[in-house]
Amino acid sequence: MVNRFDVFLVNLDAAPSGDAKNTRPGVVVSPDEMNRNVDHVIIAPLASTKARYPTRVAVEFLNGERMVILDQIRTVDKNRLVKKVGEIGESSREDVLDRLGEMFAK
């Protein structure tokens, strides 16, 4: 089962130039109803970069600060999810949802 806010290693090979490539951690941002009923999920890459942009959210993960890169969200087939490596914490979840709301609400 895949849940919103799970972090998976995601096979991102064949991504367009300039986007995150290879196998990278990604946060599932699609709602659980979608995750249960379709063969795709929406993910946002998780990176160790310290670059701060309005479309990125800092989270604590694997004993360090990571950035959820919401300006590179993408839909991927579930068979691209290689392995679950954790999930982001409660306070970070609200930050991600708030930022997504700002990006798409108006």
Feature-to-residue mapping (PLM):
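Conserved functional hotspots at enzyme active or ligand-binding sites that engage polyanionic ligands
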Residues: 1-106
